Amino acid sequence: MDVEKENYKEKYGDVPTPYFLIKEMLELIPNNLFENSHNKWLDPGCGEGSFGKQVYEQLMFNQIHIVDINERRKTILKNLFLLEKNEYYEEKIKENIGDDMFDSNIIITDYLTWEPNIKFDVIIGNPPYNSGGLKKTPTNKVLKKEKDGETLWIQFVKKSLENLKEGGYLCFIIPSIWLKPDRAKMYEYFTQYKLHKIKCFSNTETNKIFKNNAQTPSCFFLLQKVKGDNNTLLYDKCYKTYMNYNFKNSLPIPVHGVFLINKLKPYVEKYGSLEKMVIKTNSITIRIKVNKEKTDKYIHKNVTTCVLEDNKASLVINYSDNPCNYAGKMKLIMAHKMYGFPYFDEFGEYGISSRDNYVILNEDYKRLLRCQQFLSTKFAIYLFESTRYRMKYLEKYVFQFIPDIFKMEDLSLCIDDNVLCDYFGLNEFEKEEIMNFNTKPYKTFVK
């Protein structure tokens, strides 16, 4: 192991980008940009210069109109800028992209304080995600939270948009968390511009791509600095191609299953979404005390979470001295943090004593039962993957993609995967994709 390099990774958030991924990102960029010898290119956090090397090679291939090889090299190097904060990488950058005959724009400086006197046509790269320490994630068992790093990729994105020409292009790979509209407002920041294409990777896929050096869902994209139109092309893993997706009205951008979300969209527009029926629970008030065991004082039953035991969903229960929220009400309780696994609390037997569970209240027994059946299918599990913005958590945003089942009069009261696939018009290929996506034989609470 290169100990010095590992220390740089932890200190500066540096994770090398594999060449196959760089190649795929470059394929997003319109070919005419590589042909224009006047365009200026920038990698603002170039590390060893991997992006710069492939951009250089692509420019050399595309700019054959400059017949003289040396003149072509000189022109390209004049317009290709590689920035890196850490002197540690300088020699490696020169090895990858430097040319003894011509000057190279290899600049060792802090990008966030750099003030160039030019604007760029294309900015591309893998910006550092953090500085001053790795970001703590649920799968990072070593790092302590108090040593958590400062997120940098947001600053790099904003700085890069400032440094782009009007109409210029930004192509980065960054965490996927901006794809949901939240308090950070990065969704709004991105969608004000034209998003041409986006390809997303789960936390598992990201970790594999970066050889166990990255632990968060990620995406790469091609953005143009022109007014956005609420449309983009999302990569669909089922069809292995990019599909159109419209995100008007601040609709979240899914990280998975765009073909299915597009199938459901007309029903969401007709019936509304299930989101308004779903309540995300908060922590209980300090006035309520809880205990693991039932005693004379602690008599009120509550759900804290749901776990899997040999693929069987099982509620985790505690007891409180006073009733917790939602006790005494007929409801669905989705307490499993990844798959929900709705429990039908017909008689209001349970309160909810912990945060980040989901509750659906309704007094119509048959429709609530139908909703439980829907949300327990492989169809639903496939949908839940669409909003895995933070590791593998079940996000409330997914319910914006699901039509309001309570209003769908023509939907069978007895639901399974076959019923749903037929109702929403899925073909055999799509049905097979859903049925084979997760093959574990989960035993849910559906009777």
Language model features by range: what are they?
Residues 42, 81-83, 107, 171, ...:
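Hydrophobic/aromatic beta-strand patches that form the interior of the parallel beta-sheet core
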Residues 10-11, 17-23, 45-53, 77, ...:
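Signature of N6-adenine DNA methyltransferases within the class I
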